[in-house]
């Protein structure tokens, strides 16, 4: 180990003119020897506000041990997190997607300011993963992402339960399908401890995508948060980063177009969240890779859905981990010719080299099917276009018996109005709900609609109504739902001029989203449309509205 690995930090520590800088570093524990070692930033998203992140600092300490062992000098620093589960269904959800940008900005600021020679970012809750990756792309020093890990399932009356169980219980209780006592028991047992929400929801979707991208160590994505394996994953990541610095490998060499195609394939096979579309496009833009909705559409049409995972399926991430994990799935996909095996990873080796000596999926398991027995012959994430979404929209069809609907529009100007209508039985089978002015600018922040969709499922309407929005959906959502409609209502997209009673069609089999009125009538209504005032005039959300781009561009705020 030598000064030649200090390509960035040398400007902070080397030479007589940097004596004041070194004096400050001595006060935080640096020794004479440390000034000759690469400086490593460890970005921790630890927080007491959410179970997804409450254990992260313990993991950061294990990363620190690995860095020290391999000859680096580690520095743990903090960034923010919010809790999507706790923010869901109220005003706080406006801040979820903007938190992704703050995470990215803050990691970029600290590690570029300190001139860290390498960075390890540790994330737990949903926006941590893309926020961390976006920052690592901007810094483009040798980097690794470590996932905090998935939560263990809760147990209620002998049944596995999780965060979606209690969201759906709200609708069931309102409909009189469960007693108050059962409702309370589900609440008390749904979240047993540390870790991210346990199905193939957004956090686990993004951890899987990041492993497929090659930016985390093999096996990292599916390990439980509370396990010796996860602690060792962190320790090994610390050591692996020094190897990356020695080899001079940075995210720009790893995050190629083929790497993103691998990530999309894995997300589709696993039945991942619609949020993966938004976040992968955002990450790709940060690293300079051209990724669009058309890429998702192209790959989805040839990629089968194989994993029977929640929310549309039966199993949790811990179940997948027991039968071989995400790396086991990737090994199967590589054998089937569905992945680019020559993509470089943070081990310094290729995907194919990493998977060569890793175990196959457990024989005769029922969680991940073979291609010949696919749950669906194409991917569950569907890109729709039409006169309601000229720039595109995203639907998820996993676990659905019905993938199309035509019915009268029930229009709401916010999520809150729609939720109240559901809970007061104003939504009927056959309706197509439209929730607008919830886009990146209009919301602002593209609120997730888990409270709404879970209420529909709890009320028994999940298969009988359609729902479309310029907002987003939680990874825990299931039902005939379409999000990310672009252009959004705030920008004068056609969703802004739909009226109650208009006949509206969602047809996932034809990739179609349209209102059954003439183009002449659409143009007439658009001419008389007037934009709404931004809902926030001061503070971070007011700033966000001025910077954020459309969902088709990943809702990024970087000035690219």
From Swiss-Prot:
The keyword Zinc does not apply. The keyword Iron applies. Keywords: 2Fe-2S, Amino-acid biosynthesis, Branched-chain amino acid biosynthesis, Iron, Iron-sulfur, Lyase, Magnesium, Metal-binding. It holds the Pfam family ILVD_EDD_N. GO terms for molecular function: 2 iron, 2 sulfur cluster binding; dihydroxy-acid dehydratase activity; magnesium ion binding. Homodimer. It comes from Leptospira interrogans serogroup Icterohaemorrhagiae serovar Lai (strain 56601). The modification N6-carboxylysine is found at residue 127. Mg(2+) binds at residues 84, 126-127, 448. This is Dihydroxy-acid dehydratase. Functions in the biosynthesis of branched-chain amino acids. Catalyzes the dehydration of (2R,3R)-2,3-dihydroxy-3-methylpentanoate (2,3-dihydroxy-3-methylvalerate) into 2-oxo-3-methylpentanoate (2-oxo-3-methylvalerate) and of (2R)-2,3-dihydroxy-3-methylbutanoate (2,3-dihydroxyisovalerate) into 2-oxo-3-methylbutanoate (2-oxoisovalerate), the penultimate precursor to L-isoleucine and L-valine, respectively. Residues 1-20 are annotated as: Disordered. The gene is ilvD. Belongs to the IlvD/Edd family.
